[in-house]
């Protein structure tokens, strides 16, 4: 096996397994909550939309950390790598505290932005107030994981994630349904299970992080100063990613608000498909993570031809995997929706939505690898921001509003028209990739 394939497998496989396991257990969680009825499904789904904003913003911070750490490790400049880690960790914790305050103090007001259904808002507020405290361990765990993956210790976050989802699923069973003498807590029990599992995840990663830096003989350096780039460069990089990811996730929330106003059946149908969508994307997310590290290290060493060649190999792997998984999803869509105890019309809508998603999945995956991994590894985050803003707000959102409020289509028509904006993203990203101007060494 070549050195490239070894590095690809050491990063991609653990990340893929971690994402797949988390999405799989998310499906189990969704099915458990689904036994409580459509109101609970919808409430948890809407809470997840706000949490998506947090996850994407923290993901942006860890992406910046990964870009810089990978390039500086490739250039064998550990001091700059540690500076990147330190600044990103502080940034992540501040952001987590702000989101905790918003979700913990104003849950009903936030949920009211998505739906007018009082029962959904009241049910979701109970869940939201508890889940908000999980933002702190999620932020810290993400930044620590970025360092570990850049050092090719991706198995640590994987095992941490495996343990966390197992804890979460077990506690969900015990607390939602009141098993083994415990009280039947319903949706509140699901929230408590999520909170405990996130602290478990952080504890596992922190121990693994300490052991790995000792094994690698890395001497931690506490420094908020850079020598190869300026603070201004760092802030521009992180702010463009934050703006990009925030506006993208905000767009997802606008779309969810539109779905919410289409009625409970349409919203429930879309919500029950979300775990499967996460599973499909997660199954191939390891390639995006691996691309960021592998290509970033090549750029740090100024090996531009190798970076371009290896990028294409990762893209081909992603396309093949996405096509295979899409075929499987089309065949099994009806089996999945049949697991839910919901109205037959909701099941049928969910089945059709999954088939539409399967058709677009290869395009989504290529966009993830190109935009989220390869092109960003060069540090030029501005162009990705522009693509995200134009794709979401100039194409996606207008199409969504047009389909829902002008054409008066149901959830299937709205989702199908909206998702065509992924094609625009792919065309633009491929043009940028072939021009090679994204290949920049920060060292």
Which residues fall in each region the model found?
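Helix-terminus/linker motif at the lipid-water interface of multi-pass membrane proteins
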Residues: 20, 24-42, 111-118, 174-185, ...
């Amino acid at each position: 096996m070549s050195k490239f394939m070894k590095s690809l497998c050491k990063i991609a496989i653990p990340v893929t397994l971690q994402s797949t396991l988390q999405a799989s257990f998310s499906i189990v969680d969704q099915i458990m909550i689904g036994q409580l009825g459509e109101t609970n499904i919808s409430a948890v789904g809407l809470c997840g939309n706000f949490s998506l904003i947090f996850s994407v913003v923290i993901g942006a911070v860890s992406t910046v950390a990964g870009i810089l750490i990978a390039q500086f490790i490739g250039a064998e400049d550990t001091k700059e790598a540690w500076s990147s880690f330190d600044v990103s960790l502080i940034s992540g914790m501040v952001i987590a505290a702000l989101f905790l305050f918003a979700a913990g103090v104003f849950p009903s007001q936030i949920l009211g932005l998505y739906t007018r259904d009082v029962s959904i808002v009241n049910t979701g507020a109970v869940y939201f107030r508890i889940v908000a405290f999980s933002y702190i361990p999620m932020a810290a765990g993400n930044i620590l994981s970025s360092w570990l993956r850049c050092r090719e210790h991706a198995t640590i976050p994987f095992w941490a994630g495996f343990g966390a989802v197992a804890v979460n699923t077990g506690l969900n069973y015990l607390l939602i349904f009141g098993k083994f003498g415990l009280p039947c807590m319903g949706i509140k029990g699901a929230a408590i299970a999520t909170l405990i599992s996130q602290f478990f995840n952080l504890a596992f990663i922190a121990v693994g992080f300490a052991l790995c830096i000792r094994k690698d003989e890395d001497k931690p350096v506490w420094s908020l100063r850079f020598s190869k780039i300026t603070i201004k460069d760092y802030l521009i990089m992180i702010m463009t990613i934050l703006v990009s990811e925030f506006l993208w996730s905000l767009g997802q929330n606008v779309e969810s608000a539109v779905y919410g106003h289409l009625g409970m059946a349409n919203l429930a149908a879309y919500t029950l498909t979300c775990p499967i969508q996460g599973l499909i994307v997660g199954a191939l997310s390891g390639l995006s993570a691996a691309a960021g590290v592998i290509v970033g290290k090549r750029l740090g060493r100024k090996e531009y031809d190798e970076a371009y060649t290896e990028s294409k190999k990762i893209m081909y792997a992603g396309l093949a995997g996405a096509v295979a998984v899409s075929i499987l999803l089309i065949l099994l869509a009806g089996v999945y929706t049949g697991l839910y105890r919901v109205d037959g019309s909701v099941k049928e809508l969910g089945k059709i939505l999954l088939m539409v998603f399967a058709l677009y999945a290869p395009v989504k995956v290529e966009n993830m690898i190109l935009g989220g991994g390869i092109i960003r590894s060069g540090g030029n985050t501005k162009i990705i921001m522009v693509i995200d803003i134009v794709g979401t707000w100039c194409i996606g959102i207008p199409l969504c509003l047009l389909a829902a409020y002008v054409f008066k289509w149901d959830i299937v028509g709205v989702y199908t028209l909206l998702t065509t904006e992924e094609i625009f993203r792919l065309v633009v990203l491929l043009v940028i990739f072939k021009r090679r101007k994204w290949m920049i060494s920060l060292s």
